[in-house]
């Protein structure tokens, strides 16, 4: 049971726990009771976690050391069926040997879904420190350093599991276990101790509890216990799989209640289904909200997912807010002061009622005290979905998300002195006066919201949206987002219902930071400023920037200090940046007067129309220089250059430069020409990192994907933290894939957080680097106990860190190509990072690497891999999982599952087409056949009951079309295949998605 008290010893001595148990009996009078003691803790990983993890592993690579107990009996099952079988066996055993209350086990199996146990407040480093104390290890020893620096790769077996804290703990614990055999702790005992641990807030309270675990568990048990504490199980099965096996209504009940306890206790009998009235959301019961799908590779594809119709061809655009997702429940209650009761829950089901208030007259509520007149007459109860943000009353703008809790606490203490306050922005209503609205369309729900709420200015407001029909509106909205430094956009389908606990295409995120930046940083001069509105109101929030006019673009006699307008920059500024700009330009701004523009200093586009004219202007000689980056360069008649930056973002203020050393018009044109020679300019490209992460998951769930050839050519040495805490001894320069001197490699290490030394033993866990056999390298190799890594690993890690900007830093695992010399115990781990053709599981190969891999592959290998039905079936399942989660369909899988019939002899009516046309039509048909065959379709040339599509030859006569229609007319119980032209295949391939067949049917008149 939960407890907010400090650890006080056994649970049965705590009266509060007894009271909580009594309350639970009252709340769940029909709760199940177990007839026997719970199973031993070790049964969880022996019969559940390990077998599930074995299915998760990829069959390629070295032989597996462990085989699940059901491996032989489930050979012919799909991975999903195997997972279900393992889970079902465990649940059946529990019901037979323990009883119907499986909640104690599920709390440990799905710890991240257990909202009834408080967070432990313990991260990896805190656990590592406690283990060092418990095992009495010297804090400067190698094992202690391995625990504290668990993200770093090491040279020994103990430290080899970089990034897996629990695995590294296992290595250290195995050297000094209290017991080697599994312990005798039951699942119930473990839960009891974990309840105490979650209530312990100080290290001296946590230490005796972990010591008890250490005394009674072996290293393997402790490894899984640590994963439970960190809520990082990763056993190869999601909660949906567990719920689905446990009870057909389990996932639905969890979605509407967020309560693992309620799922286990109310659905303990799989034969009793939820009543219809129990399947919807309930007032004062936290539910799992709908989430927005991740951004796809193109706006056109995203718009297609909005399912526009001829009668209703619109979708909605909302600003994505930088706050905390929050649901508000309100119920009328005459027995409480103010007549209304409130509850607040976050997306993670954390109760925030204590912070925002439980009633109109709750003096500790940072929000509810202002809501006495916030609801329309007749509104008795409702549930609202929205975002809690921080509002800066002085700037009249959104404040950073990290200040939300501080603002709420400040509002609690003194509502009159605070400059920031919580603001609840509402974008949906899901329940109104006893009626569940989730099945209604978003448009209908919005109408209900407008009629139910009376906004309270800057405290309780309805989030606005705008209607759109195409990507032009999205691009324009993105420009505003960047200018105002907002979070991003959300596209919504107004015809959609609300989907509980689901990330669906009806809502899709668009964030400007996903976009590929124009490769160079540009130093531009501020020549104008625009007053902000909304979030950035009250001051100059965005700036007009210009390029210095040089001799090549100056008119005769023109003043040298003139600038051409080039772009508007409003994204990326912090409050400190704005203050710094104000400080250096104070008193130098002038109001822009349209009738008397300052053409001596600034030239806009449009002549007298004065395109993009600013509110204020400043002389270039009085101004500052900004360093900006952008998505790309685009043609524009809105700026004097004729070009502009798409989605520019401020990087830093260049106080080391003045307007004379800023970028000139000619310098920019030269820079653009050079960039275009290196790569073709792309419009509105989504960052490759998302696509590459999708490919990574289709191979093997290791740490990181690799770098691209393009990144290799452009790389100039970014700064980062990928090597933070690592020590390097670099003995040679780099020969491949690019030449780098020893000094350059050392500077790269330093620039990315690492340290370098000139001897191998100057610091603990030093990584030795060499690319050729020198005296130093030979000496290290001769010792036989040091791994020597090639410089290519450093370069690969840095490039990947740059690609994955914004994601947690994680080092690439070592591949054979990265290793100059490896110790015997390291060789197996290194070999496991690639397949038999040396194709990395964790890194995308470059074009040159792929060519070499293909050269090594024999035809027999190719045939074996492509024809193995188990491999194909497994690959199909994994690809489908990713596509369902929003990833782009791989090109080679586009027509997978379809059976397509092509006409025999590919004949056309000779009377209707000449020889040249017939040859072209024959070519189109052959190309269509090869395309679908490549993209996974089953191509047939004769009638079959499994045919899904029939391709009609170009130029077919009306009689041919009629004959085909007649021969494939529907029979009872059979579906009619689609008749399509070759154009359907061509367009599907072009759009990389399966299009509707309706627009590609052969004409009835042909």
From Swiss-Prot:
Role summary: DNA ligase involved in DNA non-homologous end joining (NHEJ); required for double-strand break (DSB) repair.
Give the EC number: 6.5.1.1
Q: Where is the BRCT domain?
A: 718-811, 890-1002
Keywords of this entry: ATP-binding, DNA damage, DNA recombination, DNA repair, Ligase, Magnesium, Metal-binding, Nucleotide-binding, Nucleus, Repeat
- The enzyme's first-digit EC class, named in words, is ligase
Q: What is its main location?
A: nucleus
- CDD domains recorded: Adenylation_DNA_ligase_IV, BRCT_DNA_ligase_IV_rpt1, OBF_DNA_ligase_IV
Organism of provenance:
Aspergillus oryzae (strain ATCC 42149 / RIB 40) (Yellow koji mold)
Q: Could you name the Gene Ontology cellular component terms for this entry?
A: chromatin; DNA ligase IV complex; nucleolus
Ligand binding (ATP)? 318, 320-321, 325, 387, 427, 487, 492, 509, 511
Q: Where is this region: Disordered?
A: 1-36
Q: Which GO terms describe its molecular function?
A: ATP binding; DNA binding; DNA ligase (ATP) activity; metal ion binding
Instruction: Kindly give the SMART domains that the UniProt entry links to this protein.
Output: BRCT
Q: Which residues make up the binding site for Mg(2+) 2?
A: 487
Instruction: Report the active site residues.
Output: 320 (n6-amp-lysine intermediate)
Family, as annotated? Belongs to the ATP-dependent DNA ligase family.
Does the entry feature the keyword DNA repair, yes or no? yes
Residues binding Mg(2+) 1, per UniProt: 387
The cofactors named for this UniProt entry are: Mg(2+)
Q: What does the entry give for GO biological process?
A: DNA biosynthetic process; DNA recombination; double-strand break repair via classical nonhomologous end joining; nucleotide-excision repair, DNA gap filling
Show the catalytic activity.
ATP + (deoxyribonucleotide)n-3'-hydroxyl + 5'-phospho-(deoxyribonucleotide)m = (deoxyribonucleotide)n+m + AMP + diphosphate
- What is this protein's record name? DNA ligase 4
């Amino acid at each position: 049971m939960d407890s907010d008290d400090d650890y006080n010893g056994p649970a049965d001595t705590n009266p509060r726990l007894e009271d909580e148990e009594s309350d639970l009996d009252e709340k769940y009078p029909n709760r199940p009771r177990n007839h026997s003691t719970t199973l031993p803790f070790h049964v969880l990983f022996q019969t559940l976690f390990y077998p599930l993890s074995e299915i998760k592993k990829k069959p390629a690579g070295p032989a597996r050391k462990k085989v699940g107990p059901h491996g032989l009996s489930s050979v012919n099952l799909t991975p999903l069926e195997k997972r279900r079988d393992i889970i079902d066996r465990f649940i059946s055993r529990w019901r037979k040997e323990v009883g119907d209350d499986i909640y104690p086990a599920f709390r440990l199996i799905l710890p991240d879904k257990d909202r009834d146990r408080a967070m432990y407040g313990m991260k990896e480093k805190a656990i590592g420190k406690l283990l060092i104390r418990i095992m009495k290890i010297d804090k400067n020893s190698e094992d202690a350093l391995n625990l504290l620096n668990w993200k770093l790769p090491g040279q020994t077996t103990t430290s080899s599991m970089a990034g897996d804290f629990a695995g590294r703990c296992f290595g250290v614990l195995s050297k000094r276990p209290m017991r080697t055999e599994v312990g005798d702790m039951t699942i119930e005992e473990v839960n009891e101790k974990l309840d105490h641990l979650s209530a312990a807030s100080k290290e001296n309270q946590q230490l005796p509890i972990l010591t008890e675990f250490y005394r009674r568990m072996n290293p393997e048990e402790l490894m899984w216990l640590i994963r439970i504490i960190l809520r990082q199980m990763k056993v190869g099965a999601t909660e949906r799989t567990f719920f689905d096996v446990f009870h057909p209504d389990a996932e639905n009940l969890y979605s509407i209640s967020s309560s693992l306890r309620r799922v286990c206790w109310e659905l303990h009998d799989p034969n009793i289904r939820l009543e219809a009235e129990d399947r919807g959301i309930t007032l004062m019961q936290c539910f799992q909200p709908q989430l927005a799908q991740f951004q796809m590779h193109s706006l056109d594809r995203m718009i297609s997912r909005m399912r526009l119709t001829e009668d209703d061809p619109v979708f909605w655009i909302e600003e994505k807010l930088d706050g905390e997702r929050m649901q508000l429940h309100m119920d009328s209650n005459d027995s409480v002061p103010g007549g209304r009761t409130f509850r607040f829950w976050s997306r993670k089901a954390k109760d925030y009622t204590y912070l925002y208030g439980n009633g109109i007259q709750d003096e500790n509520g940072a929000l509810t005290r202002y809501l006495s007149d916030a609801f329309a007459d007749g509104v008795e109860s409702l549930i609202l979905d929205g975002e809690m943000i921080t509002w800066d009353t002085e700037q009249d703008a959104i404040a950073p998300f990290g200040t939300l809790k501080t603002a709420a606490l400040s509002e609690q203490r003194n509502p009159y002195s605070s400059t920031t306050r919580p603001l609840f922005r509402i974008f949906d209503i899901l329940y109104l006066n006893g009626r569940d609205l989730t099945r209604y369309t978003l448009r209908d729900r919005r109408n209900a919201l407008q009629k139910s709420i009376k906004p309270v200015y800057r405290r309780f407001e309805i989030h606005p949206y705008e209607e759109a029909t195409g990507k032009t509106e999205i691009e324009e909205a993105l420009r505003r987002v960047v200018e105002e430094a907002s979070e991003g956009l959300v596209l919504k389908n107004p015809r959609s219902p609300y989907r509980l606990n689901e990330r669906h295409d009806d809502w899709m995120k668009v964030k400007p930071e996903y976009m590929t930046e124009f490769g160079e940083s540009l130093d531009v001069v501020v020549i104008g400023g625009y007053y902000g509105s909304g979030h950035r109101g009250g001051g100059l929030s965005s700036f007009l920037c210009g390029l210095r006019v040089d001799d090549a673009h100056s008119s005769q006699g023109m003043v040298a200090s003139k600038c051409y307008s080039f772009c508007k920059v409003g994204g990326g500024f912090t409050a400190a940046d704005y203050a710094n700009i104000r400080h250096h330009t104070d008193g130098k701004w002038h109001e822009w007067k349209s009738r008397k523009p300052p053409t001596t200093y600034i030239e806009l586009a449009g002549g007298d129309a004065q395109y993009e004219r600013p509110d204020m202007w400043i002389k270039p000689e009085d101004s500052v220089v900004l360093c900006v980056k952008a998505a790309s360069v685009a043609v524009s008649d809105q700026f004097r250059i004729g070009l502009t930056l798409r989605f520019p973002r401020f990087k830093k203020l260049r106080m080391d430069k003045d307007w004379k050393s800023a970028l000139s018009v000619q310098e920019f044109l030269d820079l653009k020409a050079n960039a275009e020679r290196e790569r073709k300019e792309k419009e509105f490209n989504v960052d490759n990192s998302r696509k590459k992460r999708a490919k990574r998951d289709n191979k093997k769930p290791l740490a990181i994907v690799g770098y691209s050839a393009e990144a290799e050519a452009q790389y100039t040495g970014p700064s980062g933290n990928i090597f933070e805490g690592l020590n390097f001894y670099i003995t040679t320069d780099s020969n491949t894939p690019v030449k780098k001197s020893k000094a350059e490699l050392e500077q790269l290490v330093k620039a990315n957080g690492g340290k370098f030394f000139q001897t191998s033993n100057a610091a603990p866990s030093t990584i030795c680097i060499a690319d050729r056999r020198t005296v130093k390298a030979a000496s290290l190799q001769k010792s036989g106990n040091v791994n020597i890594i090639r410089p290519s690993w450093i370069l690969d890690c840095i490039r990947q860190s740059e690609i994955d900007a914004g994601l947690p830093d994680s080092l690439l695992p070592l591949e054979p190509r990265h290793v100059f010399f490896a110790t015997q115990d390291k060789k197996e781990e290194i070999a496991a990072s690639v397949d038999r053709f040396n194709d990395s599981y964790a890194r995308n190969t470059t074009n040159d690497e792929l060519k070499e891999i293909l050269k090594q592959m024999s035809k027999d290998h190719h045939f074996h891999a492509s024809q193995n039905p188990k491999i194909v079936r497994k690959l199909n399942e994994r690809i489908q999982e990713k596509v369902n989660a929003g990833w782009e369909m791989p090109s080679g899988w586009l027509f997978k599952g379809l059976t397509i019939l092509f006409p025999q002899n590919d004949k056309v009516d000779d009377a209707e087409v000449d020889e040249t046309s017939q040859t072209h039509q024959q070519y189109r048909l052959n190309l269509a056949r090869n395309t679908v065959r490549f993209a996974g379709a089953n191509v047939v040339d004769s009638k079959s009951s499994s045919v899904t599509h029939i391709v009609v030859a170009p130029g077919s006569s009306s009689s041919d079309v009629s004959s085909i229609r007649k021969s494939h007319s529907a029979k009872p119980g059979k579906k009619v295949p689609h008749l399509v032209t070759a154009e359907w295949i061509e367009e599907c391939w072009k759009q990389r998605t399966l299009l509707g067949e309706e627009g590609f049917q052969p004409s009835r008149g042909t």
